Amino acid sequence: MLQVYLVRHGETQWNAERRIQGQSDSPLTAKGEQQAMQVATRAKELGITHIISSDLGRTRRTAEIIAQACGCDIIFDSRLRELNMGVLEKRHIDSLTEEEENWRRQLVNGTVDGRIPEGESMQELSDRVNAALESCRDLPQGSRPLLVSHGIALGCLVSTILGLPAWAERRLRLRNCSISRVDYQESLWLASGWVVETAGDISHLDAPALDELQR
């Protein structure tokens, strides 16, 4: 059975400031660096063999810290990037106009073809993150990969594995540097394919972490 671990990046400056990041970027805070070191210690105990990361700066830095602890190289995969939030990226969440807030709500509430101008839909996000996960099945037998990605992207991935719509990600609380695990299994009695073992574990962190509504 293939076990794949999913880690959200450490806290960033814009997480703390409640700015919309999307595929724009801000550096990890000192707290985010500490979170990454704590999740790295946990990852080392798990016997991780491969680290596959979004190529955005905040995930790169988180992955570098984990890789140093695990002694692994990093593979960067743009399919693990966060949802493209278009013209709303870099904006403070409380500064949105009524029209802009409607764009955001249509996107996260699952309105058909909902998207922010110049951004992408939840279905487009789902297609690419699920394709990235599926690529893990091509790794050598006995591999135990860890994917470093983003809150909405990972929430979307876990939701769709559970058979929920992509926009159901908002019902999951995946805090900074939380660990989730999904397994690929072939079983006559249990669900074949990808199953969710755990989601949003933060037992390795020594202080509260921000959730997606606080980014």
Swiss-Prot record:
GO cellular component: cytoplasm
EC number: 5.4.2.-
Pathway: Carbohydrate degradation; glycolysis; pyruvate from D-glyceraldehyde 3-phosphate: step 3/5
Keywords assigned: Glycolysis, Isomerase
EC class (word): isomerase
Gene3D superfamilies in UniProt: Phosphoglycerate mutase-like
Keyword Isomerase included in the entry's annotation: yes
Matches recorded under Pfam families: His_Phos_1
Keyword Hydrolase recorded: no
GO biological process, alphabetically ordered: glycolytic process
Site (Transition state stabilizer): H150
UniProt-recorded Gene Ontology molecular function terms: phosphatase activity; phosphoglycerate mutase activity
Catalytic activity: (2R)-2-phosphoglycerate = (2R)-3-phosphoglycerate
Active-site annotation: H9, E82
SUPFAM superfamilies found in the cross-reference section: Phosphoglycerate mutase-like
Binding residue positions for substrate: 8-15, 21-22, 58, 60, 82-85, 104-105, 151-152
Annotated PANTHER family: BROAD-SPECIFICITY PHOSPHATASE YOR283W-RELATED, HISTIDINE PHOSPHATASE FAMILY PROTEIN-RELATED
Similarity comment: family membership: Belongs to the phosphoglycerate mutase family. GpmB subfamily.
Protein name, as recorded: Probable phosphoglycerate mutase GpmB
Species name: Escherichia coli O139:H28 (strain E24377A / ETEC)
